[in-house]
Curated annotation (Swiss-Prot):
Gene3D superfamilies: 2.70.98.90. GO terms for molecular function: membrane insertase activity. It is a multi-pass membrane protein. Belongs to the OXA1/ALB3/YidC family. Type 1 subfamily. Residues 29-42 have a biased composition (Low complexity). Interacts with the Sec translocase complex via SecD. Specifically interacts with transmembrane segments of nascent integral membrane proteins during membrane integration. It is found in: Cell inner membrane. Residues 28-56 are annotated as: Disordered. Keywords: Cell inner membrane, Cell membrane, Chaperone, Membrane, Protein transport, Transmembrane, Transmembrane helix, Transport. GO terms for biological process: protein insertion into membrane; protein transport. One of its GO terms (cellular component) is plasma membrane. This is Membrane protein insertase YidC.
Amino acid sequence: MDSQRNLLVIALLFVSFMIWQAWEQDKNPQPQTQQTTQTTTTAAGSAADQGVPASGQGKMITVKTDVLDLTINTRGGDVEQALLPAYPKELGSNEPFQLLETTPQFIYQAQSGLTGRGGPDNPANGPRPLYNVEKEAFVLADGQNELQVPMTYTDAAGNTFTKTFVFKRGDYAVNVNYSVQNAGEKPLEVSTFGQLKQSVNLPPHRDTGSSNFALHTFRGAAYSTPDEKYEKYKFDTIADNENLNVSSKGGWVAMLQQYFATAWIPRNDGTNNFYTANLGNGIVAIGYKAQPVLVQPGQTGAMTSTLWVGPEIQDKMAAVAPHLDLTVDYGWLWFISQPLFKLLKWIHSFVGNWGFSIIIITFIVRGIMYPLTKAQYTSMAKMRMLQPKIQAMRERLGDDKQRQSQEMMALYKAEKVNPLGGCFPLIIQMPIFLALYYMLMGSIELRHAPFALWIHDLSAQDPYYILPILMGVTMFFIQKMSPTTVTDPMQQKIMTFMPVIFTVFFLWFPSGLVLYYIVSNLVTIIQQQLIYRGLEKRGLHSREKKKS
């Protein structure tokens, strides 16, 4: 019997299945409903209820910092385009990655303003405000650490509204400050809002992962409250008018894609309403509306919110808002992926190469797990030593399965052998492999990260398939060096073709993940030889492999 070997095959297949399932769940997550009120509001009703009108024509102004290149529409003050100069669109390209976009093919905008009964963005008060600006281009100059972009609007009643975007050097968090001067004789009720809207369907120029299932990650909306730290909300769910309606203090709303995110973070002590809406024409939205504020006659009111528009850099996002770093979605194994990434990042601070960091972390992980590996091989060796007795027992008892089972368990007990002893270490190792997959797919630091020679992007597949082939070779050597008692011809064929099957399967995996597996296999070969030498001294192993 070679149950441990069969368990290894099952374990590898299970890992592969879990990765595939993770991909499916990331593409199509189930909406979380325990903290939401499901509604079936129409698209027009949703927008009107939230006091968020559609944008109109205005003048476009540009804002450039060292990390952001934005285009803002003076009609409403919405951010309609966002380029990230520090992140190329593709490996080797001089074209910056575009996060926000407003074109006939695709809409992705960050809207904000003031609603409420007296708010200029309230549809009942007419078209959205057309702000005045002192110039059309703003640039963060060398030596300048902060850039302010003020926009002003005065309504028919003489009330003045100022919307100021505040940019800081090296920062993807943009503060949006509001100043409301009440020139009337009655209190003015206003409420800040922030909304992210996006086309559901991706055009070809944005669907970068369409040719590789391993590169698909979650794309959709998300929100956070003190009760629900991080909840996804699928675009298709919003498009079906199953909308979110949550009231909470604090929190944020966001739209996510692989490596990048946008988020609105309200900055107030009151209650915010988080919502989603189907805006029609294949466009969905997630946003917040803050608790109204009364500005007394002759007084000036101040409000603020924060927009994150950029890469998912965990430490920076955590500093902007609680749990915003959870948008780096490591899936259900986040509690393993996060420590692994912190360790990987710490190693990288010394070696300066993410590929070598993966190699080192593989040695560390496998070193920590060596006692489990040794226990696994010892258990498998003991099981092999019992095979003659088990075979004799089966011949003696014939087809009496019940007695076979009883005597086999008695034999295991007498010999102090746990038949599942070789399985537990495999079960423990599987989450490590899956967690590393999540880490590679979700960490912006590994995007376009080179290793050596032909590997220029550890988050992408090997363009020449050399690493998957090397992985298959190492798997073949492990198989050949492992003792076996398999006698069934079908099982023998399956075991023979396992390296080939997994080589084909790994062709489309991120090269960083395949690199981890190669190094892990090499460590297995080394540990295997060390363990076998110890087992030989105990009479539990022979260098002469049994013929099948």
